[in-house]
UniProtKB/Swiss-Prot annotation:
Gene it is expressed from: prfC
Name of the protein in question: Peptide chain release factor 3
Top-level taxon of the source organism: Bacteria
UniProt-annotated binding residues for GTP: 25-32, 93-97, 147-150
UniProt-listed InterPro entries: EF-G-like_DII, EFG_III/V, G_TR_CS, P-loop_NTPase, PrfC, RF3_C, RF3_dom_3_sf, RF3_GTP-bd
Species, as recorded: Crocosphaera subtropica (strain ATCC 51142 / BH68)
Keyword Transport: no
């Protein structure tokens, strides 16, 4: 066999073993806990740190930033990689706080599958619906985990109906809960035709002990109260008679969601979910690019930057580019082309990511996410490649809803202030705009919610040593002008708005309210305004 054929076979085998997914949920649905339990079953950690039953337990592995540890919320995306039964899994952990939907969107651009986490007591919540729409836009397969079954909640059949009616998805319950709240006894696996009975252990900090009983085994009556058993049998009959059959083609097309029930905190159903997910999930697929769809088994390496993070290691003040490998084989120290600038870049010190912990890696394949040292070369959406030039679709910016000048009251900290703004802007922690008035040089922070302002101020102080102040602006809508500055000049004077420029120097109109926006549309029908920024492919940030 020739060397080329050997490499192609190696790439094909590696891609078959890759599974990549992001978890989406409303805040407090238990996302960080589920993430940790998947790592626990994958052997990546030995004791789950999300559980606060004992003081000596470590903080949640995926919440690594200082502010996250202080507040107990996820405010930045991280990547967690682990192996399970010969699969290489890339888990993209997304922010749980609603202010960070934009960072979540960028992460979903790198994911092949999404896991939708739902609180059994609350059902579908606003943030879940919003993120579901982003998944639908991207055509991602969606797997649903109904969490907190060990607490009082809504009827499982009612939850299935809500998903079908509100999201327009067909549902297939892969497992089914037996009891709920204090009477929750475990789950029935429809794949195995067996009941998994679980026992609480150390508040779920270690893998759950379980007994498995086949349906029809007389022992069932020893474990389950008669009423629970009859209710379970009745539910099962309804599912079998009225429910859809599992259709993986429909799952992969994002039209059907396999549903799992469990409790991440106490480990009920977590391993069953992981094993079924690995069997059903989409492996890395072809991606749209400037040269058409490129398959992950294509022999030449390519990938795109979906996230930048400064100061992941506070001791070294480093900057890391998160790259989704799309095709071919990545190798340490390889030289690649940078599509936006046309420059060649040597990729030394590549890293396998695990929250803030990193280890050097020698190789990676389609579906993997790697960390690259970023000496100011990369921007979000950048493509790197070997061989024939190609560029993947960029990642758009969404319309912010809050605006504020960020001021530096201490002139002696000017350099640190500028460095912090530049790095946080490149990272996409917040959108930054500037006034068109040359006398107003303070950057305008443009955020989805208030927490983003707090994060920027916190990081400016803790990472760059700069105390800052905010001067809020009375605007709530931003619209990009298609056609740029020339279109704006032709329109002449515009009332009910101010004009600012974005990171790429493009004109953006800010409005105080929807009425102001509609008035400008009436007065200037020739202006084409967009709530999503044009993708900055082939452009240099200002």
């Amino acid at each position: 066999m020739s060397m080329a054929n050997e490499i192609e076979r190696e790439i094909q085998e590696a891609v078959q073993k890759r599974r990549n997914f992001a978890i989406i949920s409303h805040p407090d649905a238990g996302k960080t806990t589920l993430t940790e339990k998947l790592l626990l079953y994958g052997g990546a950690i030995h004791q789950a740190g999300a559980v606060k039953a004992r003081r000596d337990q470590r903080k949640a592995t995926s919440d690594w930033m200082e502010m996250e540890k202080q507040r107990g919320i996820s405010i930045t995306s991280t990547v967690l990689q682990f192996e399970y039964r010969d699969f290489q899994i890339n888990l993209l952990d997304t922010p749980g706080h609603q202010d960070f939907s934009e960072d979540t969107y960028r992460t979903l651009a790198a994911a092949d599958n999404a896991v939708m986490l739902i609180d059994a007591a609350k059902g579908l919540e606003p943030q879940t619906r919003k993120l579901f729409e982003v998944c639908r836009l991207r055509g991602l397969p969606i797997f649903t985990f109904v969490n907190k079954m060990d607490r009082p909640g809504r009827e499982p059949l009612e939850l299935l109906d809500e998903i079908e009616q509100e999201l327009g998805l067909k549902t297939y319950a892969v497992n089914w809960p037996i009891g709920m709240g204090d009477r929750f006894k475990g789950v029935y696996s429809r794949r195995q035709k067996a009941i998994h009975l679980f026992e609480r252990r150390s508040h779920g900090s270690q893998q759950a002990q379980e007994d498995i009983i086949k349906l029809g085994d007389p022992k069932i009556e020893e474990y389950l109260e008669q009423e629970l058993y009859y209710q379970f049998k009745e539910d099962l009959e309804i599912l079998e008679e009225l429910g859809d059959d599992l259709d993986l083609a429909e799952v992969h097309a994002g039209k059907m969601t396999p549903i799992f029930f469990g409790s991440a905190m106490t480990n009920f159903g977590v391993q069953l979910f992981l094993e079924a997910f690995l069997e059903y999930a989409l492996k890395p697929e072809g991606r749209n690019s400037s040269v058409g769809v490129v398959e992950p088994t294509h022999p030449e390496f390519s990938g795109f930057v979906f996230k930048l993070q400064a100061n992941m290691d506070p001791k070294h003040r480093d900057r890391v580019a998160f790259v989704r490998v799309c095709t071919g084989k990545f190798e340490k120290d390889m030289t690649v082309s940078h599509a936006r600038t046309g420059k060649t870049v040597r990729l030394s010190r590549p890293q396998k990511l695990f929250a803030q912990d990193r280890a050097s890696i020698e190789e990676a394949y389609g579906g993997d996410v790697i960390g690259l040292n970023n000496p100011g070369v990369f921007a979000i959406g950048d493509t790197i490649y070997n061989g024939k030039k190609l560029e993947y679709e960029g990642i758009p910016c969404f319309s912010p809803e809050m605006f504020s000048y960020l001021k530096n009251p201490n002139p002696s900290k000017f350099k640190q202030f500028q460095k912090g703004i530049k790095e946080l802007r490149e990272e996409g922690a917040i959108q930054i705009m500037y006034s068109t008035d040359d006398f107003k040089r303070d950057p305008i922070l443009a955020a989805v919610g208030q927490l983003q302002f707090e994060v920027v101020q916190f990081r400016m102080l803790s990472e760059y040593g700069v105390e800052t102040s905010l001067e809020p602006l009375p605007y709530s809508l931003a619209r990009w002008v298609k056609g740029g500055w020339s279109a704006l000049e032709k329109a002449g004077r515009i009332f009910n708005t101010i004009t600012v420029k974005d990171n790429w120097g493009r004109p953006v109109l800010l409005f105080k309210n929807e009425w102001g926006l509609q008035q400008v549309k009436v007065d200037h029908p020739e202006l084409n305004l967009d709530a999503i920024a044009p993708v900055g492919v082939g452009m240099e940030p200002e």
